[in-house]
Amino acid sequence: YPRDMMRKVKKATEIVGPTYIHAHAPCTTGWGFDTSKTLEIAKLAVETCLWPLYEMENGEITQVRKIKNPRPVEEYLKTQKRFKHLFTMEGGEEEIKKIQAIADWNIEHFGLQ
């Protein structure tokens, strides 16, 4: 979501005093995916609700990008070699359920739907 990032950076530069931007930056080498997939993987992180896009001011959430139909976390995990073991090892299914629970918590906590 490049426009979202640009808007947030612009807003941060207009604030007097400190600001903080926590950006999601997929790593092609460490995560094991082709460079051409960088934006797709970054968007999947948001669309699976593993990486919520939101803003806070003075400790309060002020804006949240809603996700009408969250995608299953498997779609995000399968794109990266670092998660390959979850789909081949015994007990991997349980670990994926735990990761899905994180996304579900994000949906509830941040009001993503």
Where are these regions (language model features)?
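Structural beta-strand/beta-sheet cores of well-ordered domains, especially the beta-sheet scaffolds
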Residues: V16-T19, P52
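Short, conserved beta-strand edge motifs with alternating hydrophobic and charged residues
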Residues: Y20-H24
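Conserved thiamine diphosphate
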Residues: Y1-I15
